[in-house]
Every structure is written in C-alpha cells, then in structure tokens.
Amino acid sequence: MRLRLGVLLVALVAAVPALAAGPSVEGNAYLVQNGTTGEVLLSWNAREQLPIASITKLMTVLVALEHVQLGDIVTVSGRAASIGESSIHLRRGERISVRDLIEAALIQSANDAALALAEGAGGSVAHFVELMNEKAAALGLDDTHFANPDGLDAPGHYSSARDVTRLARIAMKKRVIARIVAKEESSISGNRRLSTWNDLLSTFPGTFGVKTGHTAAAGWSEVAAARAHGVTIYATLLGSPARRVRNDDLTELLAWGLTRYRLVTLISKERVYAVARAPFGRAPLELKVPSEVRRFVRVDRSLVERVVAPEGVSLPVRAGQQLGEVRVYRGSKLLASRPLVATRSIAKPGLFGRAGWYAGQAAHNAWSWVT
C-alpha cells in the first residue's frame, strides 16, 4: 500500500480576509455561530448573565408546545388581559387558540399573549415558570434562569448570548416556530393584525428569524438567523443602546459570519484518486470513491488529504471492491473519508491464459536480451 499526502486549497482562501477582529459592536454581549455545526466564530462576554427581554418568549412557546396543541382554546384571565407593555389587547374571558397566542407572542412580542399561553399550558404562571427552568436545565442552558414567561425585567430573570443562541437553534427545529418567526406580518382572530419587531426580516436578505427583545434593563437585544449560499449563521446581540444600532450591528455580524464559509467538495466521485497496476497484461485499474462529500468549511483553514491505495492488485477484482481509502483532515480532526473502490471488474485468467502470458513475457525478455 502507498500513502499520498496533499494539501487541499479551499476555494477563495486568498479572496477572503483571515479571521481577524470582527465588526465593531456596541452592546453588552454578542456571539456569532454556525447554525449547522454549532461552531462559534466570534464572541464577546458570551457567558455573562444578562436580561434578555422578549427573547424569553422563545422558551415560553417551546415549553407550551410540550403541553398544549395548536388548536386548543385558552380563556384569557384578568391577569393576562391587564399586563402592560407590548400587547394585542386581549380581553378578560376572551377565548383564543394556542396558535394565535403563539403568533402574537413571537411576531408582535405580545406580553398578554405570552401570559395567557403560560396559564393555558401550565395551569398557573408560577408552575409554567418552573417548567421553563426545568427545560432550560435539560437543554444545558447553564447561564439561564426565568422569573416570568414574558421577559419583563424581574430579579432572577437572565440568560447569556451563548444560551440565547442555543435556545434559538433548538426552537427553530420546531416547524411551527420556524414558520412564524419568519413572518413580517400575520392576522389572527379578533381582526388583529400582527407586525414583527424584527427589522432584519426586511432589511437583510436571507434572514429567517428569530426573536427581538427590549426593556429598560435589557436594552435592544436580538437573536437573528440568516442563510446565504447554503450557509446558516446565528448572531445574538444583547444590550445594544438603540434599535438602529442593534440592527446595524447585527447586519455586520451576520454578514461577517456568512463570509467565513464556503461549500467545498472535499472528496469527489468524479476524480481518479489512484491507478493500480493489474497483472497478466491487463490495463491499469482506476480507483474512485462511490460517493462524494461536500461540506461547509472555513475559508481560512487548509485541509490535508491522505490517499491510501495499493500500487498493484491481485486478481480477480470486482467492480466496487474496496482497495483503499481517502481521508480529509483539518489539523488532526477527520472531516471526511470514503473508500477507494475498483471502477471495473478484472477476472483472473485461467491456467492456459496465465501460461500464455508468461510465455509471451519470456519471449519478449529473450528478444530484448538478444537485441
């Protein structure tokens, strides 16, 4: 067997600046993460416990979906109807579906909808908050603790940029949540028209969520997600001083993150990785992989390819038979591997065939010696 090493030059390495300092951001904490692999690209104060305002409603909806169905009906309590700040003006005794409450909580960031949802799913706000904290612990959100389902400022209500990003990625796995947070507007019962607070949905191409938040203590905060050319990036910014500043900084963070990756064919099924000698005068045997591997890789990282293949083969060989392997590494980490297989079958000659070949070789050698 032989081992061949090579360096794969990732496309556009020279065209994109190396991962130097990211954009200048105003705020208390931020984090930029690959939404597919979870790789953190950039962060600052990512573990600091901070108020997160209405980003809380991602957990509210996530927990509610474990206890009620979208078509269930909730009767609005006086407490829910009277809560202040952002609301859809629910009325005490009003009957409204869980689906409508979720849309109002995620799009309009309605506090009354979040409270009604918590009461409908948990029986009481206090019990529902317990469920929220249990869920946070189960998800490994170690920097997080909830005191209410709406996100209004309260002692003991906090999270971190790291946890918020993780929560958003988990919540987006729920189709109903992913569909709702991508909407700029919606209509629900009671002739209510909902409008999103997420300005990036209309200003930054590829944005598909997820949740904003604003209170006096939390400042202007948001976890946003955008996709371009097959790359998904999440960016969380907590404690920005103004809505415009938050939007501008998140735009920079998302754009920065999206330029860090390219989709690269690490292992190609069209490429001949090795050619092995075949005995008895047979044509050399090309070795390929049965399937290719395409991955998103950082544009500033070089990859090492290792090809393990035989110099020659023994017959018979069948098409598809594994004879070697291709591996691609980033540093010491194995990113991909595929078997090297024969591209055609080669039968072993019979006794007379082998004898004839040996005789021909002997005659050729003798003639070469004479001449």
Regions found by a protein language model. Give the residues of each.
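Intrinsically disordered, low-complexity
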Residues: G6, A20, A366-W367
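Generic detector of short alpha-helix boundary/capping microenvironments
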Residues: L8-V10, V25-E26, E48-Q49, A81, ...
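Active-site-adjacent loops and short helices of periplasmic peptidoglycan-processing enzymes
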Residues: A20-R175
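Bacterial N-terminal signal peptides
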Residues: G6-P17
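Sterically constrained small-residue positions within well-ordered secondary structures
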Residues: A11, A21-P23, A226, P316-V317
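Domain-terminus/edge residues, biased toward the C-terminal soluble/receptor-binding domains
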Residues: D153-Y158, R162-T371
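Positively charged n-region of N-terminal signal peptides that target proteins for export
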Residues: M1-L5
